[in-house]
Amino acid sequence: MTQAVKLASRVFHRIHLPLQLDASLGSRGSESVLRSLSDIPGPSTLSFLAELFCKGGLSRLHELQVHGAARYGPIWSGSFGTLRTVYVADPTLVEQLLRQESHCPERCSFSSWAEHRRRHQRACGLLTADGEEWQRLRSLLAPLLLRPQAAAGYAGTLDNVVRDLVRRLRRQRGRGSGLPGLVLDVAGEFYKFGLESIGAVLLGSRLGCLEAEVPPDTETFIHAVGSVFVSTLLTMAMPNWLHHLIPGPWARLCRDWDQMFAFAQRHVELREGEAAMRNQGKPEEDMPSGHHLTHFLFREKVSVQSIVGNVTELLLAGVDTVSNTLSWTLYELSRHPDVQTALHSEITAGTRGSCAHPHGTALSQLPLLKAVIKEVLRLYPVVPGNSRVPDRDIRVGNYVIPQDTLVSLCHYATSRDPTQFPDPNSFNPARWLGEGPTPHPFASLPFGFGKRSCIGRRLAELELQMALSQILTHFEVLPEPGALPIKPMTRTVLVPERSINLQFVDR
């Protein structure tokens, strides 16, 4: 009750706007009358809760963005208990908000994840840290991941993983389907690829994800990744007091994170032992390569607990981003054979005569390959929405958003806005090759923007380019006969509503 009173008091206070706001507040429409938080349109609390819990809203949060924008306009608000959220679904307003970011931008933290770290005495990684701790971690990791040259340095390591993926796809064809070329649940296969790839980069070792028999601890980790997003969505939708009455989602979330931390800790401890041997002068040829992220963190004297926290969270982020995007890309290419044929021709011509690793520089120069990935990320952004919590009053459109207000950036809605993307629900990579109007640069932000942008963007793009080039070099990808179209659903991240099954036919 006290929190509700404080919130009401704060909102009332903000109605009486200060005489002088930050200069950024007047950057647009200075002639307009500024309005307060209470003036923002939106559903009643009752209808908002009904939409969320009684109409399957948790699994279609991305669709609610589109419906909200259509009904209330580019900015609206909704309340859940004492928490009021402002939703922004216009690229101009998204840009206006993000341009006002502070030195350490704060987003809505996965509070249940942070609570798990606190209760289980685990270090926060880049996904759960905030403030100065987040800034320290970001500064430490960015040079190793965000610089294009740094990401390109992992191409040799990833090349071996991609070749193993092609071999695994061959082995999986026809298993349990009756069709000789059909691979069931390609997302499951690409989960294994995603973990193997990010594991090789972070730990410098192979995890066995793409072998005929996947190690049990690796299978446990992969299952935990899929499960934790479901439990996260449930725990975030429930007020804290309800966790005591319905303990299942919280217990499941803790189990999932404990399994992932245990997996990461085993592998980090192995790398710690190798680092100790290096310090003792043991010959390098007796140990795995030292060119991996964990090696650099040990060299920078980062604590083992912090390394484990970061490796755990980066493994999670790396698995889901690559697996879902790769699944959606091949799904769309199987349904658009003309695009697939053109892309295969571009890859063949663009990599002919290249050196041992044509995937490095050559693939980054292929315009259609890059356009296909951009179009898939527009249609199926891994994270359909992002958030910010401003540390001061800011202006968005003609509204003043008070400090500490949760603002949700509706990336799914802006990326399917027909005013930005004609025929927005259609797969059309040509829109990124100069065909049609140029969209607002903030209409599609699959990797975010600014200091809070995805730190693994360069690595993810490299993995996707390399995997697609090898898969399309070896296979023609066809849809499952008689399969109905597949829609996305929200599971914290955006995933297929059911398994994607595809045929991989030798070229």
From Swiss-Prot:
It is an enzyme of class 1 (oxidoreductase). It comes from the Eukaryota. Heme binds at C454. It comes from Mus musculus. Its EC number is 1.14.15.18. PROSITE patterns: CYTOCHROME_P450. Pathway: Hormone biosynthesis; vitamin D biosynthesis. A cytochrome P450 monooxygenase involved in vitamin D metabolism and in calcium and phosphorus homeostasis. Catalyzes the rate-limiting step in the activation of vitamin D in the kidney, namely the hydroxylation of 25-hydroxyvitamin D3/calcidiol at the C1-alpha position to form the hormonally active form of vitamin D3, 1alpha,25-dihydroxyvitamin D3/calcitriol that acts via the vitamin D receptor (VDR). Has 1-alpha-hydroxylase activity on vitamin D intermediates of the CYP24A1-mediated inactivation pathway. Keywords: Heme, Iron, Lipid metabolism, Membrane, Metal-binding, Mitochondrion, Monooxygenase, Oxidoreductase, Transit peptide. This is 25-hydroxyvitamin D-1 alpha hydroxylase, mitochondrial. Belongs to the cytochrome P450 family. Kidney. The gene is Cyp27b1.
